[in-house]
Amino acid sequence: MVYNIVGDVMLVAICARLEIKNGKKRWFITDYFKKLACHLNWTLIPIVSSKDVQKISELCHALIIPGSGNDINPKYYKEKPIFKNQYYDEEYKLDKAAIKAFFGQNKKIIGICGGMQSLNVYFGGTLFQDIDNHNNTFHPIKIINSTFLSSYYKKKTVKVNSFHHEAIKNIASNFQISAISNDNIIEAIESENILGLQYHPEVLKDYNIFKHFIEK
């Protein structure tokens, strides 16, 4: 496989996350992903504007869509909100533009937590807007046979972290489920060039799962 590199460093795009405090907007990348890039000798290229997506997608080998503290507006999967949340459409629109560009070039995409949810909604899936017992905890997940995760973990159950209150309800038709929790919440999805994980391997310092999927 041929990589886009500078020296020996592979270029991987990452969608910045949006935070608004006291009316001030800030786009940022968490330290967890900075440490991941350092460990794998990757260079992360932040995406902070939809205007930059096409150029960055042509330059980079793969895309990471991280988790977010912001929920996706249910209007994007044709449902009404059950909460009176303030939704920041700008962040999801950035994810959409990035997914479209990288998917259109058959490049690898990994979505983490809310990033997996963005992938599912983009391709026509829906979400549970609120679930119990999955925020700030650890729990086991069951790995589905004949998936990327089964080849990576080589075991039937794995204990993972959990920091979410939304989850996939109807999975988009182009994905298969690759892991579920004991209460039947979808914990991972995949297709040929896309991997979605509801948990946070970067927090657990499981950097190899990124390397194995993106560089395989």
Task: Identify the residue ranges that each predicted region occupies.
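N-terminal beta1-alpha1 cap of cysteine-dependent amidohydrolase-like domains
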Residues: 1-114, 122, 128, 132-153, ...
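Short catalytic/ligand-gating loop segments at beta-alpha or beta-beta junctions
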Residues: 159-165, 189
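Beta-strand-turn-beta hairpins that frame and shape the catalytic cleft
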Residues: 174, 191-194
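Short, surface-exposed beta-strand/loop micro-motifs that present aromatic residues
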Residues: 185-191
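Active-site-proximal beta-strand elements of phosphoester/diester hydrolases
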Residues: 195-200
